[in-house]
Amino acid sequence: MIKQGMNILKENEKKRLDFNPELKQINFLDRRVYKRSEGVYYPSVTTILQYMPKNKFFEGWLKDVGHNADYIMKKAGKEGTQVHEAAERLVLGEEVSWMDDYGNAKYSQIVWEMILKFAEFWKTYKPELISSEDFVWSDEHKYAGTADIVCKMNGETWLLDIKTSNSIHKSYDLQLAAYAKGLEESKDIKIDRTGIIWLKAHSRGPSKQKNVIQGKGWKLLQIDEIEKNFELFKMIYNLYSLENPNTEPIYNSYPTTIKV
């Protein structure tokens, strides 16, 4: 049963744990690093980008929300996780329901609205899925991460990142560039275009311009300059490396069975 359970884990989840059936112990890796291979760990792209200098808007936001900052960020993180999980199920052809098997709501109104917006994008533009939530890495530059969606649109290979934030940040461009380079190195997938599916956009509906992809409350922001953004990412990585010369994981160990 345990082996069956391990088999249904996503590939990127497997990169964050070690399972020892003989000791009946499972070790979860912290969220800052990925396991590339036995004894080899790379920092995550999102962790590296936390070392990107924050602008005045961020400093002002921290002053405004004060002690509520942690709560707000955790709540936003939970919403983003729910939207990403639902989006992955949708692109794989599964049905997503607002209610669980017991008739209880699984999602808040805000989360469900964002899921519906993503579904509208996918149903309207019908991208050809190549992969979703794919573990990517770069042995040359020593980082790893999870790419949201790789697909074909209009004959081009796109890397798409789903964002549920209230605003769009420059770090997102660098994140996409790092994933694009990681896909090329680890999966031999050449990315032609990158884009952000922003599910809290202020758009009022479809655009009359043919090259603009958007709907009510959502928009595909097309991000160019992969090479330039990757150079910026490497600069941020240098800042990260100064503060973290050794990427050593922190494990949380738990038994696989318990009895009281």
Sequence positions of predicted segments:
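A generic structural motif
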Residues: W137, V150-K152, L199
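Metal-dependent nuclease catalytic cores that hydrolyze phosphodiester bonds in DNA/RNA
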Residues: M1-A144
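Metal-dependent nuclease catalytic regions and adjoining charged, substrate-binding loops involved
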Residues: L183-V260
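Conserved catalytic cores of phosphodiester-cleaving nucleases, focusing on short active-site segments
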Residues: V83-H84, G145-N166, Y179
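Active-site catalytic microenvironments for nucleophilic, acid-base chemistry
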Residues: R89, G93, K181-S186
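DEDD superfamily 3′-5′ metal-dependent exonuclease/proofreading module
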Residues: I2-N7, K15-L17, M153, W158, ...
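Short, charged, amphipathic alpha-helix that recurs within catalytic cores of restriction-modification
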Residues: L174-G182
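Active-site-adjacent loop/helix micro-motif of nuclease/hydrolase catalytic cores
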Residues: K142, I168-L174
